[in-house]
Every structure is written in C-alpha cells, then in structure tokens.
Amino acid sequence: MTLNLRVLSPNRVIWDSEVQEIIISTNSGQMGVLPNHVSLVTAVDIGVMKIRLNGKWSTMALMGGFAKIDKDRITILVNNAERDVDIDLQKAQETFRRAKACLVQAEGKRQVIEADVALKRARTLLEAINASPSDSN
C-alpha cells in the first residue's frame, strides 16, 4: 500500500506522488505516517522530512507549516521546502555560517529569536543533505 503525498508552498508544488512512508517533524516531536494512518491535522516544525519511496529514503527540508493526514492522503502546506537533491551544499554551509554569526551579534529579544529561527532553517538544510552543521564552522 502507498500514501499520496503532496507538499505545497505558496509558490509551487514541491512534491506530488505516491510514497510508502514519511517521517515529519511536528511541534511535539517526530511522527511517522504509514498507509491507513488515523486522520489528523498537525503543525509541522522546521525540520527534515524523510520520505520512503521504492524502498529508498530521501529527505526534504521543511520550513514550517501544517499537515493534513486523511488515511492514505497527506497534504503538507509549508512556508518553504527544498528537496535534498535541490540543495546546494556550499550555499547551505555559507547560509549556516552567516546565521550563526547573526545569532552571536543579535541584540535584544526580537533579534535573538529571528536569528535563532534563521539558524534552525540553515541547520535543517544541511541535515537534509546529511551534512553535519559542525562541518560548517
């Protein structure tokens, strides 16, 4: 059995095909979804989604949103997302370095929160392509 997975951002359809299983990051932790999953709606955290298709795993960096699961149909609405094959390693590493520097220089609560979110997004891009953020120092 398979699941119909659709990942949509405001600008484009990022994924629209059958998969065997997914694992997503929610605000309360990671959640695995298999065929005939109970119906629910959940917030999606900034994090890596793992997708199993034809017995192989791939990943996608999700930048927050919502997921609606209805038995064998999953619709994920995200602010932005990038498939692992579309992420440029050097660009992701540079984004991580800049985000880290911004966090160090942040002054005031708002700047710290914004810099922390930017760092989490940058780290997620690296994790989606299996590059350790510590490799980007």
Curated annotation (Swiss-Prot):
Localization terms from the record: Plastid, Chloroplast thylakoid membrane
One GO CC annotation: chloroplast thylakoid membrane
Bilayer topology annotation: Peripheral membrane protein
Keywords, in A-Z order: ATP synthesis, CF(1), Chloroplast, Hydrogen ion transport, Ion transport, Membrane, Plastid, Thylakoid, Transport
Superkingdom of origin: Eukaryota
Broad class of the protein's primary localization: plastid
Classification via CDD domains: F1-ATPase_delta (cd12152)
An MF annotation (GO) of this entry: proton-transporting ATP synthase activity, rotational mechanism
InterPro entries: ATP_synth_F1_dsu/esu, ATP_synth_F1_dsu/esu_N, ATP_synth_F1_esu_C, ATPsynth_dsu/esu_N
Pfam families in UniProt: ATP-synt_DE, ATP-synt_DE_N
NCBIfam families listed in its UniProt record: ATP_synt_epsi (TIGR01216)
Family, per entry: Belongs to the ATPase epsilon chain family.
Oligomeric and partner information: F-type ATPases have 2 components, CF(1) - the catalytic core - and CF(0) - the membrane proton channel. CF(1) has five subunits: alpha(3), beta(3), gamma(1), delta(1), epsilon(1). CF(0) has three main subunits: a, b and c.
Cited function: Produces ATP from ADP in the presence of a proton gradient across the membrane.
This protein's name: ATP synthase epsilon chain, chloroplastic
Organism in which the protein naturally occurs: Pinus koraiensis (Korean pine)
Gene symbol of the encoding locus: atpE
